[in-house]
């Protein structure tokens, strides 16, 4: 079970970017600097065109009242334990972890709050800081050591319908950052479940994460109370204090992609430069052509996730 750690003396009195809505305060650097205003939310909120309200409870709970939640007996554990005894995501980066859904126990479950299958729902467990980078605007870094597999933060914001996504993208200029992310999950019957999240105006600290071609975070959809997944970011390796946190905007990192998803990411003509500095840097940020209306081609004022 999560507990709020004591705030380090050096962080006391500093701006809390999270406005007191997270387990731990999120400081900003340099002192006196403050990111552009936005409405903070630690969780998804329903936006225009959303197919489902992420705040509604749609999953039944397990009946593990007197026994621990284990695969085969707990309805929330479909295949195997999601986390180990240290609250680390099991087999992170493996093909199985990228293809099997992750369900945590929820508010209707009869198991204890100390259940090992409750991790993402407890929020921030490490001190994070929003900071000004040299070439990428604002970024997010950790002030603590983060072991491989531990949950770091969510990417939370407005859950949108595709028409609203395309409308918002069309209004962007080449100089605007696009925070909208499209998550596509290929289910057993060949269908694709799409989730669109935009934290530009309403979101959490995940909006400050920059792209890297060799990131230290991996995004995994995690479901708790609703079919709308939480976009949970886990440490793909051990992360040292003051390291910038990043993930791969394209979803390619440690993940198998379907051919149609690769095509969506490769069709873009206009690309923003990538400043991640990785040895395998692709030189340009990923571009998702599906965010544009299929009947229209983006002109010089439009760009994908950046």
UniProtKB/Swiss-Prot annotation:
Positions of Zn(2+) 4 binding:
213, 274, 276, 281
Q: What class of enzyme is it?
A: transferase
The GO molecular function terms of this record are: double-stranded DNA binding; histone H3K36 dimethyltransferase activity; histone H3K4 methyltransferase activity; histone methyltransferase activity; zinc ion binding
Q: Which residues hold Zn(2+) 2?
A: 62, 76, 105, 109
Q: Domain Pre-SET spans what residues?
A: 60-123
User: Which positions does UniProt annotate for Zn(2+) 1 binding?
Assistant: 62, 64, 69, 74
Q: Which residues form a coiled coil?
A: none
An individual GO BP term: methylation
* Location of the protein in the cell: Nucleus; Chromosome
| Domain spans labelled Post-SET | 270-286
Instruction: Give the highest taxon in the source lineage.
Output: Eukaryota
The free-text domain note is: In the pre-SET domain, Cys residues bind 3 zinc ions that are arranged in a triangular cluster; some of these Cys residues contribute to the binding of two zinc ions within the cluster.
Role of this protein: Histone methyltransferase that methylates 'Lys-4' and 'Lys-36' of histone H3, 2 specific tags for epigenetic transcriptional activation. Specifically mediates dimethylation of H3 'Lys-36'.
Q: What is this protein called?
A: Histone-lysine N-methyltransferase SETMAR
**Organism classification, top ranks?**
Eukaryota, Metazoa, Chordata, Craniata, Vertebrata
């Amino acid at each position: 079970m999560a507990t709020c750690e004591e705030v380090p003396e050096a962080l006391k009195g500093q701006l809390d970017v999270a406005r007191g809505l997270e387990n731990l305060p999120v400081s900003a650097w340099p002192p006196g600097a403050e990111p552009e205003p936005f409405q903070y939310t630690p969780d998804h909120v329903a936006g225009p065109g959303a197919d489902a309200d992420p705040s509604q409870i749609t999953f039944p709970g397990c009946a593990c009242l007197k026994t621990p939640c284990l695969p085969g007996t707990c309805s929330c554990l479909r295949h195997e334990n999601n986390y180990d005894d240290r609250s680390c995501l099991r087999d992170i980066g493996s093909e199985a972890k990228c293809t099997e859904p992750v369900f945590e126990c929820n508010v209707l479950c009869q198991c204890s709050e100390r259940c090992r299958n409750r991790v993402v729902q407890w929020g921030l467990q490490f001190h994070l800081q929003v900071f000004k980078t040299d070439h990428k605007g604002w970024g997010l870094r950790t002030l603590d050591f983060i072991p491989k597999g531990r949950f770091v933060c969510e990417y939370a914001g407005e859950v949108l319908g595709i028409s609203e996504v395309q409308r918002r993208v069309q209004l962007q200029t080449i100089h605007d950052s696009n925070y909208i992310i499209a998550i596509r999950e290929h289910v057993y019957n060949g269908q694709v479940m799409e989730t669109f999240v935009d934290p530009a105006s309403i979101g959490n600290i995940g909006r400050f994460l920059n792209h890297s071609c060799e990131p230290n975070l991996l995004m995994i959809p995690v479901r708790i109370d609703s079919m709308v997944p939480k976009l949970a970011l886990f440490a793909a390796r051990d992360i040292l204090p003051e390291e910038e946190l990043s993930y791969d905007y394209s979803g390619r990192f440690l993940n198998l992609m379907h051919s149609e998803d690769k095509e969506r990411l490769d069709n873009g003509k206009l690309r923003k430069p990538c400043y991640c500095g990785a040895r395998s840097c692709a030189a340009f940020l990923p571009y998702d052509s599906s965010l544009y209306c299929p009947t229209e081609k983006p002109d010089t004022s439009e760009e994908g996730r950046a």
